[in-house]
């Protein structure tokens, strides 16, 4: 069995995934086993198209500062951050809040 979720990259962050904003993913975990930490690993291995772009998304093993993370439209800090247990149907939105100028 696997978990079906949606991952979105907004605010220019889609550049790390060949300019694809929305990804429907089937992650190879049983319901109740996978956490956001597992999802971050999945994203770095399966969605980020160029390994050189991983530092754009990850810093010190987690999502880098300046990226807003929402789980089902709720700030991930309210949901337990990396420890949140993923459920089928969840939507994860990663939005860059940093802009050049």
From Swiss-Prot:
Post-translational modification: C-terminal thiocarboxylation occurs in 2 steps, it is first acyl-adenylated (-COAMP) via the hesA/moeB/thiF part of UBA4, then thiocarboxylated (-COSH) via the rhodanese domain of UBA4.
tRNA processing keyword on record: yes
A molecular function (GO) term: protein tag activity
Site of covalent link Glycyl lysine isopeptide (Gly-Lys) (interchain with K-? in acceptor proteins): 101
Biological function: Acts as a sulfur carrier required for 2-thiolation of mcm(5)S(2)U at tRNA wobble positions of cytosolic tRNA(Lys), tRNA(Glu) and tRNA(Gln). Serves as sulfur donor in tRNA 2-thiolation reaction by being thiocarboxylated (-COSH) at its C-terminus by the MOCS3 homolog UBA4. The sulfur is then transferred to tRNA to form 2-thiolation of mcm(5)S(2)U. Prior mcm(5) tRNA modification by the elongator complex is required for 2-thiolation. Also acts as a ubiquitin-like protein (UBL) that is covalently conjugated via an isopeptide bond to lysine residues of target proteins such as AHP1.
Protein name: Ubiquitin-related modifier 1
Biological classification of the source: Eukaryota, Fungi, Dikarya, Ascomycota, Saccharomycotina
Family: Belongs to the URM1 family.
One Pfam family it belongs to: Urm1
InterPro entries noted in UniProt: Beta-grasp_dom_sf (IPR012675), Mopterin_synth/thiamin_S_b (IPR016155), Urm1 (IPR015221)
Modified residues (1-thioglycine): 101
Pathway as given in its UniProt record: tRNA modification; 5-methoxycarbonylmethyl-2-thiouridine-tRNA biosynthesis
GO BP annotations, alphabetical order: cell budding; cellular response to oxidative stress; invasive growth in response to glucose limitation; protein urmylation; tRNA wobble position uridine thiolation
Swiss-Prot/TrEMBL keywords: Cytoplasm, Isopeptide bond, tRNA processing, Ubl conjugation pathway
HAMAP family: Urm1
Annotated compartments: Cytoplasm
Keyword Cytoplasm among UniProt keywords: yes
Gene for this chain: URM1
Gene Ontology CC terms: cytosol; nucleus
